[in-house]
Amino acid sequence: MSLTDTIRNTFVPIHREGYPFIAGFFVVSLILGWLWDPLFWIGMVLTVWCIYFYRDPERVTPMDDDLVISPADGKVSFVGLAVPPAELDLGYEPMTRVSVFMNVFSVHINRSPVRGKIDKVVHRPGKFLNAELDKASTENERNSVLIESPHGKVGVVQIAGLVARRIVCWSNQDDELSVGERFGLIRFGSRVDVYLPSDATVRVAVGQTAIAGETVLADYGTERGEPVVRIA
């Protein structure tokens, strides 16, 4: 094994979105340390925390169009029927929704739950209520992504929360996403909702831990052989 491979396997990758913040914390630490030595170490603790916050570990994603994979790390906080946000244009009838709540210690990178083409991306300003509240789905600031998957339209909604006030989505309309592909992040935790077609069968329960890019949230009940996976 080469030195490069050893380093890559030892240290968790950091997402590029975190580079400016990590550099900023480090520079501030140097300035504070010049004023008073103990402040340098306080600043370095915050710098390390920032590195941890923007970690972006590889995930082993099953490449199966009949599976819906978790878009976020965290706890499954809701499984049931709910009316999707109007901007998704999915109608006014309730759809199956699975919500994953991310806390401040979760990996904050969001991944596509399915393979498909993005029909639209819509950002809506709103409140910053506790993301664990059900009304946060309609009242909080959010970013809604509609994906045309092999089994129909799937809605993915990034929701800001009490602490999280910055939603990032670098994917755009007409982009093609692979299942498990990174499409955005929510700083300081919050929640991601997934709205599924009626023929999807949910495979998780409230309170269960979900891992972005790996945990199967739902499937379409078809028989399948040995799964093909992608590490990314």
From Swiss-Prot:
Single Gene Ontology MF annotation: phosphatidylserine decarboxylase activity
EC top class, as a word: lyase
Mod. after translation: Is synthesized initially as an inactive proenzyme. Formation of the active enzyme involves a self-maturation process in which the active site pyruvoyl group is generated from an internal serine residue via an autocatalytic post-translational modification. Two non-identical subunits are generated from the proenzyme in this reaction, and the pyruvate is formed at the N-terminus of the alpha chain, which is derived from the carboxyl end of the proenzyme.
Reaction catalysed by this enzyme: a 1,2-diacyl-sn-glycero-3-phospho-L-serine + H(+) = a 1,2-diacyl-sn-glycero-3-phosphoethanolamine + CO2
Primary site of residence: membrane
Cofactor annotation: pyruvate
Pathway this chain belongs to: Phospholipid metabolism; phosphatidylethanolamine biosynthesis; phosphatidylethanolamine from CDP-diacylglycerol: step 2/2
Active site: S190 (schiff-base intermediate with substrate)
Site (Cleavage (non-hydrolytic)): G189, S190
Cofactor info, note text: Binds 1 pyruvoyl group covalently per subunit.
Superkingdom of source: Bacteria
Modified residue annotations for Pyruvic acid (Ser): S190
One Gene Ontology CC term in the entry: plasma membrane
GO BP, sorted A to Z: phosphatidylethanolamine biosynthetic process
Bilayer disposition of the protein: Peripheral membrane protein
Keywords: Cell membrane, Decarboxylase, Lipid biosynthesis, Lipid metabolism, Lyase, Membrane, Phospholipid biosynthesis, Phospholipid metabolism, Pyruvate, Zymogen
InterPro entries in alphabetical order: PS_Dcarbxylase, PSD-A
Protein EC: 4.1.1.65
Localisation per UniProt entry: Cell membrane
Function: Catalyzes the formation of phosphatidylethanolamine (PtdEtn) from phosphatidylserine (PtdSer).
Family: Belongs to the phosphatidylserine decarboxylase family. PSD-A subfamily.
UniProt subunit comment: Heterodimer of a large membrane-associated beta subunit and a small pyruvoyl-containing alpha subunit.
Name of the protein in its database record: Phosphatidylserine decarboxylase proenzyme
Organism: Brucella canis (strain ATCC 23365 / NCTC 10854 / RM-666)
